[in-house]
């Protein structure tokens, strides 16, 4: 355990002292409101009123200096006509601006970490969520077992605050942090209901994402710390995450738990064939070794959540499956490893033999049933997959209707071009194509048959099927065989940085 303590002492100087004058500068909140939030590609528009401006933010900061408390009551905002149109606007702007301020030191450390690892140039490509699938193709064909792990949400938002306690030593910082959360949570209750966390995350998107991401980074840093168990612990993307005040005692407790339950030490978990992949709150743990080791990792994660984060998780929520027999769902794809058998004729003198050679291949399949369920929820079809019209768009122009349908179809086609089998993708395109025709027919108060007959042709809808072929024909203008092979094969794009709403059907 001495090597852990020595390592943790190396980064003791990284503990943060936040500059509170910076937190109470009005231009920070103006920046958070005017630019960083509404134009962010990572955080969607949180719905601020268009009437608000930098002047409102300045008046709010002035009012904060004159108040004895930071959070103004809802009754006060209702009485004041200036704030009456949106009683949560003031706390929302402050909390989001506060998130911008506290992100600054951590983003600087992350940038320095990337520079040390010399991966800054390729950082943009690493942002693509599709970059994980080539890794699956290269590595998972050699693995045997996979486990779906969903990182549990903390039952109380105070746990998210406590994770920052290992980094920040200023008490006023946490008082300010709790004031933002107090408006949405009942702190008299020992357990915060899920609806409070949901409400808080929707109204304070960036603030909640900062707390939750820090909670996940805390979990992953401990996971990787114990996984490596060596003196060389400065992993490329996680070197900024190892400063902990009470970490040494937690490690000792985990060692005692495993020594008691499994009669082994932590060195048992040094598995060179373990692979860990995460996106948002879902992670994949895969290994080549026996299922006994995977079970050890399973109970290790449960104990980690229970003793370090005080989050209860049932063992039955983590399933361990064999890759050759079960599929795992990740990033909108169903993936599994199947064996392709190929016959090879071998001849020796006058005798000939036929030998079957099995090669493992990763299959990525479009989950047609969940995707149809998402289309039905968005009113493009019914639960059986039969296309229906979109009444909300029937009052728009023809160009707007066609453009919206084409955009959705292109996005789905772009995302699912890595599928091993394109039949399900064609079915989704057909649903959207027919839904577009029915919406246009509804707008013109006609039947589908009469609308198409009056139109005389449906060539203007052929883009639903020919877009990929046209793109690939520009790349390979003289190689028709190469074009057909690529169109039928898998294509991964490095410009996809988030999941489409229809794809994210969980």
Curated annotation (Swiss-Prot):
The keyword tRNA-binding does not apply. Belongs to the intron maturase 2 family. MatK subfamily. It comes from Styphnolobium japonicum. Coiled coil: none annotated. The keyword Lipid biosynthesis does not apply. Its main location: plastid. This is Maturase K. It comes from the Eukaryota. It is found in: Plastid, Chloroplast. GO terms for cellular component: chloroplast. Keywords: Chloroplast, mRNA processing, Plastid, RNA-binding, tRNA processing. GO terms for biological process: mRNA processing; RNA splicing; tRNA processing. InterPro entries: Domain_X, Maturase_MatK, Maturase_MatK_N.
């Amino acid at each position: 355990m001495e090597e852990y303590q020595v390592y943790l002492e190396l980064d003791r100087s990284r503990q943060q002292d936040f500059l509170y004058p910076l937190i109470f500068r009005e231009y920070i909140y103006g920046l958070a409101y005017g630019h960083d939030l509404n134009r962010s590609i990572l955080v969607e528009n949180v719905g601020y009123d268009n009437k608000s401006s930098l002047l409102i933010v300045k008046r709010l900061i002035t009012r904060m200096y004159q108040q004895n408390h930071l959070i103004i009551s809802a009754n006060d905002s209702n009485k004041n006509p200036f704030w009456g149109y949106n009683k949560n606007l003031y706390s929302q702007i402050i909390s989001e601006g506060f998130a911008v301020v506290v992100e600054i030191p951590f983003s600087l450390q992350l940038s320095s970490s990337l520079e040390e690892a010399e991966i800054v140039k390729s950082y943009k490509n690493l942002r693509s969520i599709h970059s994980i699938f080539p890794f699956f193709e290269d590595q998972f064909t050699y693995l045997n077992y996979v486990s779906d792990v969903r990182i549990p949400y903390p039952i109380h938002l105070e746990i998210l605050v406590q994770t920052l306690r290992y980094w920040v030593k200023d008490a006023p910082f946490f008082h300010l942090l709790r004031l933002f959360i107090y408006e949405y949570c009942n702190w008299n209750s020992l357990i915060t209901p899920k609806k409070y966390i949901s409400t808080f995350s929707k109204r304070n998107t960036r603030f909640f994402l900062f707390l939750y991401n820090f909670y996940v980074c805390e979990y992953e840093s401990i996971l990787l710390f114990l996984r490596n168990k060596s003196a060389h612990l400065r992993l490329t993307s996680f070197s900024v995450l190892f400063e902990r005040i009470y970490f040494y005692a937690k490690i000792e407790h985990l060692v005692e738990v495993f020594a008691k339950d499994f009669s082994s030490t932590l060195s048992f978990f040094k598995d060179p064939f373990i692979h860990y992949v995460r996106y948002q709150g879902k992670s994949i743990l895969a290994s080549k070794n026996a299922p006994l080791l995977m079970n050890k990792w399973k109970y290790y994660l449960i104990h980690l959540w229970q003793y370090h984060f005080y989050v209860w998780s049932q063992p039955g929520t983590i399933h361990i499956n064999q890759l050759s027999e079960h599929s795992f769902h990740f990033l909108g794809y169903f993936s599994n490893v199947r064996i392709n058998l190929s016959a090879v004729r071998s001849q020796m003198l006058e005798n000939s033999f036929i030998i079957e050679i099995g090669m493992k291949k990763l299959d990525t399949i479009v989950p047609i049933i969940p995707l149809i369920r998402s289309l039905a929820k968005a009113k493009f079809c019914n639960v059986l997959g039969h296309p229906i019209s979109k009444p909300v768009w029937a009052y728009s122009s023809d160009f707007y209707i066609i453009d919206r349908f084409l955009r959705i179809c292109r996005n789905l086609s772009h995302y699912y071009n890595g599928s091993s089998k394109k039949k399900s993708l064609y079915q989704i395109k057909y649903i959207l194509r027919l839904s577009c025709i029915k919406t246009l027919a509804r707008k013109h108060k006609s039947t589908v048959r009469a609308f198409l007959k009056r139109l005389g042709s449906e060539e203007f809808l052929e883009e639903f099927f020919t877009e990929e072929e046209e793109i690939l024909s520009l790349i390979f203008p003289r190689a028709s065989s190469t074009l057909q092979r690529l169109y039928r094969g898998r294509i991964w794009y490095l410009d996809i940085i988030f999941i489409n709403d229809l794809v994210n059907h969980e």
